[in-house]
């Protein structure tokens, strides 16, 4: 009888310990989410991948930035294949328009497109980099943007895009992204964060940072 009571107490104690551990783990996970939301406002940003992916990667970029184009061509495809498509990583893009006046126009275009169709933004993301010229030139024009929308983005309504491109809401969103970059003291583009931690943007460095987070 005594041994049965001890066994029952042991089971109760074990369950209590598991509950405490689970509560702590849940708290840690939510603390990370809260930290990320505070730093990056995940829910307001362009995203690629599953919402429940355990690792959040944030890219601050400018469509006029040559290094950002290189990142799009060399790093993103591998990141997508090895992590995003497998549900391990969700990628967020945050505007950091710092090179020229037309950087803001490119950022606004991305926001206006994403507002209509999320997948179309990532097509635009590739297309505008393919059209990239010297960063000293003001090459992001409304004509270029409209040609991309008309020729490459069938899910985006052209007239609505024109209205949104210069709308107050879109301008405020781009401005908030710029403010966020300043608060984080972003020094250049692409600047990449892995679960809130600044990482080198080359694939090997990102892979190490991501794998480290996946092991936690």
From Swiss-Prot:
Residues 1-25 form the signal peptide. This is Probable disulfide bond formation protein D. Keywords: Disulfide bond, Oxidoreductase, Redox-active center, Signal. InterPro entries: Thioredoxin-like_fold, Thioredoxin-like_sf. May be required for disulfide bond formation in some proteins. It comes from Bacillus cereus (strain ATCC 14579 / DSM 31 / CCUG 7414 / JCM 2152 / NBRC 15305 / NCIMB 9373 / NCTC 2599 / NRRL B-3711). It holds the Pfam family Thioredoxin_4. Belongs to the thioredoxin family. DsbA subfamily. It comes from the Bacteria. The keyword Transmembrane does not apply. The gene is bdbD. Disulfide bonds join 65-68. Transmembrane segments: none annotated.
């Amino acid at each position: 009888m005594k041994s049965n009571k001890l066994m029952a107490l042991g089971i109760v104690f074990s369950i209590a310990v598991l509950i405490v551990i689970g509560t702590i783990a849940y708290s840690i996970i939510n603390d990370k989410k809260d930290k990320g939301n505070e730093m990056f406002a995940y829910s307001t940003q362009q995203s690629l991948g599953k919402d429940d992916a355990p690792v959040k990667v944030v890219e601050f970029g400018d469509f006029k930035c040559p290094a950002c184009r290189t990142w799009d061509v060399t790093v993103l495809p591998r990141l997508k294949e090895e992590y995003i498509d497998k549900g391990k990583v969700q990628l967020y893009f945050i505007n950091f328009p710092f090179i020229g006046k037309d950087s803001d126009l490119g950022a606004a275009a991305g926001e206006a497109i994403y507002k209509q169709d999320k997948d179309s933004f990532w097509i635009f993301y590739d297309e505008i980099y393919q059209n990239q010229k010297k960063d000293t030139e003001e090459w992001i024009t409304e004509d270029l943007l409209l040609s991309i929308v008309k020729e490459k983005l069938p899910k985006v309504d052209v007239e609505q895009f024109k209205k949104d491109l210069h709308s107050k809401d879109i301008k405020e969103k781009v401005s908030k992204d710029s403010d966020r970059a300043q608060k984080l003291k972003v020094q250049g583009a692409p600047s990449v964060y892995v679960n809130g931690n600044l990482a080198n943007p080359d694939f090997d460095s990102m892979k190490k940072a991501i794998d480290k987070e996946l092991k936690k």
